[in-house]
């Protein structure tokens, strides 16, 4: 979609064959000779685009406006469209370069129009040879301009005669942009604006102001410069004497943004010049480099948000005048700062120097610092360039450099005339361009000074000079500013905090860090937000860089805001010295084991397993700690032990006999107070995500909760900004786009490569210029269908715009029904006011098929849904990545879909991950119904807690108290030392745990004794709970991450440590160290670990009422994240696959193809039934990456638990086979069957020990893997097949009489994808293997069976 928009803009900015308005037939010829270029007529451009009708001189009626090197546009005769390519049509490489340049210019145009809006359409007149439009940027300037243009227009001496007009912008930069685009013609600039006008906006200087009189003659080497800056010091000081000795000195400056003062001469000009000459080393941008060069300064205003946008500039820039910036601002303030001894040097211009020299009483008190020595104040310093620290360009007049040569010459002539007629007149009698005193503009509220100063022109100026095009204008200024403009700021690290105490601590850390050599290589800053969600959003939006997040915040930050962990914040009571804080455990009373009689018969020392967890009552420590509720409950939800039906609370309440989760009473606890549980309702933001609509409306209203809270708006670096494109549409700047021929073959061929969107050309290939009667009828039918299916309204909405959203939808639908007679494209344009995207699709709608129109409708509606408009309007790729849209695009635009998906993506996995996407309409509750159900289950869950009010069950110790009191059987806990001490003193056993290498009996849980040192917790746990981490945006570079990590590690061992850790600090009192995280784990999925990750993914899944989940005999799958590791686990990829769950019954099946059928009870398990091979993106620990296909499961069914089940057919059991005399006896060499295989004579029918394919006499089903297959007579090509992944010592026998339902391990893919689980050995079915003395190998068991059979045969004989 973004590419379609970009293509249209690019197509309109090129000279392509077209018969539309603004473009003449033919193509641009190759660049002509230099002489032709000089003599040719220049042509202007409008809206940043070239227009042929600018070539309107006599004889140029068919000329085209063509652009060549150095951005020069001239009128040239075109090459006819029907001329063969060999005659001179541009070669493909030239076309590629031209389109690429057009793309860059279009992006620059869109960026600027967002910063500097275009004038309204009434004032957006096109450039003509007879009109000159002067642009000003204030009301006072406009007053003077109106009088000025009146004089110019009606004066008979202002020849050549022109019509002069004024146009007012809001800033000088906006004026520059308007002139660049042809919406204005001329303006004056001063100081730093002179550089911006020429470099940023491509304007051309034609004249400059100056002051020449007897007292101030023009100095040739300084004629282009308004001011020359000098470094002034007190003559009492020995140092500094040279520029290099300015290092580590204190400096005073007039300021950086104060009005009515010559600021560039005081700061920017000298600093940039000293950087250019190598005096000031480059350590960041020019302000940062200067602050590192000097010791302390007084630069009034430098920390204001106008300049200090990131809030990271060092406080040392205002240390000398922190509380008195206004007092020391301006030239007088800077001199006062110097004279008072606060600073050792200040920077002033030549006018100040001359004023000091004119006073003999103070002249000897100062000296100027030059490159090699300090000098007294004398006239020689003005011509001695070694004493010039900086230069300020004179006020300069700029015009569009793409004006025609004639218009440029006319304007220069008129500037000379303007000076002659109005430059030296009596200001009291006649109009004078340099006089501003006659205009009443009020006074400045800050200073009380009148505002009618230096309007348009400087009052001190008295003449104007035309710039000589053959010479460099203001070269010293451009040289210095070019250096500064290319400087890269220090890596920024703004820490986001959520309370005032942490914010003040962050400010203290910033002040300390700016004085530590290695740490100050980073620009530190602080951001105060209202909540952790706002901090995540700030980091995502690049207004902050770091945020300390606990494990649940880390998960939400990564999943919703694309943030990555950078460093872990080590807690001082962590169980390890790495990133692990604690481990999630569960404990059960020994007396509760009596509920499971089967455990009593297990011999001492043998493992005990609990299968039916639903028989238990549980106690939780509450929702404040991840290990207390989210980790264990989430993991049981993820592996299917607890069926997810409705909300998490409802699922838990349905499953266990009783539950105590303290402090979740519905009267006091809200869903949005918990980051994981609150995602269900978008953290309290109003939403209609569960409202009962019908059909497509239901789908669209249910999708917000199935997608990210924020967007991937920074995912595609080359994407165009939709908001700015909308601005173009609003200002009618895009009408020319649809006058281009979208089906131009050359442009279509370039689309995929140049725009970077493979498949976008599919949208425009084969587009027809007309629609036949059938097509029109089809469009009318489509229009009627969509008008009844879609409620349309304005696409751009804000958070406050959702209260009456349903009513607006109904009203919009009625409007659609009333507009049936309108063309479909017009209806869309009327409905979606302001959307350029709709314009593009309307054009395509008229030319292509209903597939595009359907996609356009879906996209438009998704963009109107809450939380898809508030934050996701920035890039259209966001909408394309929406699951509902992706599923449609994958069918109809498969190539286009591959552009906007991650390397690993699958429709089926996506549907299971966003399960409301497939939830039936009749099972989708309304919001209030859902909330009522949640509250009912909250009430029931807290009954167990509230019925024992005298006992406090809050926290981990409260949960253990709950167990001891007999209220519950089992509780969640943690391996933290303070909790484990309580465990050792309590009559409890650890249980409900997950082994490090799971036995094949999960979701049973092994019960083990609590050892003295709690070492069992290292392997028996629900997963490790990680320490909090500093998260940052996903698209920060590797160098940035290392610079920040290194700086924080150095700060940890410096005087900054007390500001980082302790009471009232940035990290807090419970933490003591920052640990770097390896790049391979700098994503939230691998850092959190598989068990906690799946636990949280299960908690945040959208609620669905899938009735089948708690029914036996049903198998289904849930999508979760998995980590694929390769190359000795040094490379990993993050993928999605399916976890198979369910409780299938035993299945009775008949086996055998011939002979009597046998009926066998077969154990069924939920297993993957469908696999796909998708590309995965592997990242390695050394920064290397590669793409490689991996196989993953996408669907589940009830299947055999084992890959192979062996059985013996009925006819092999006949007694006949016990007598070898039953063989067919050959009658001699002449027997006709001698050369024919006789199956009844095969020896293994009579002696089964001769072939391992038979295991007779075993009436149970043997479930095992066959390691070796042996044939009696090996044939060529048949080899022994060995499976090295199988453990030959594992043997399992299933008793069909006692086993009624599955208890197998969750299918994670260990067997079917060995490369993902290296070192894993398949372990058979779900029943506990025989161990110890009773364990028998398969060979031993087989021999025993055969011995019994042989005994029967001998007895028969």
Curated annotation (Swiss-Prot):
Q: Which UniProt keywords apply?
A: Glycoprotein, Ion transport, Iron, Iron transport, Metal-binding, Repeat, Secreted, Signal, Storage protein, Transport
Expression sites (tissue/organ): Synthesized in the intestines of the females and males and also in ovaries and testis.
Glycosylation site list: 198, 227, 304, 310, 402, 499, 530, 541, 572, 578, 625, 639, 692, 732, 741, 1035, 1043, 1081, 1128, 1208, 1241, 1258
Q: Its GO CC terms?
A: extracellular region; signal recognition particle receptor complex
Keyword Iron among UniProt keywords: yes
One Gene Ontology term of the biological-process aspect is:
protein targeting to ER
Q: Which PROSITE patterns match?
A: TRANSFERRIN_LIKE_2, TRANSFERRIN_LIKE_4
Enumerate the Gene3D superfamilies for this protein: Periplasmic binding protein-like II
Where are its TM segments located? none
Q: Its Gene Ontology molecular function terms?
A: metal ion binding; nutrient reservoir activity
Check the UniProt entry and state the signal peptide residues, or none: 1-15
What SUPFAM superfamilies does this protein's entry cite?
Answer: Periplasmic binding protein-like II
Q: Please state where this protein is localized.
A: Secreted
Q: Which family does it belong to?
A: Belongs to the transferrin family.
Q: What does this protein do?
A: May serve the following two functions: a classical role as a yolk protein precursor and probably shuttle iron to developing germ cells.
Q: What is this protein called?
A: Major yolk protein
Q: Which organism encodes this protein?
A: Strongylocentrotus purpuratus
Q: What is the lineage of its organism?
A: Eukaryota, Metazoa, Echinodermata, Eleutherozoa, Echinozoa
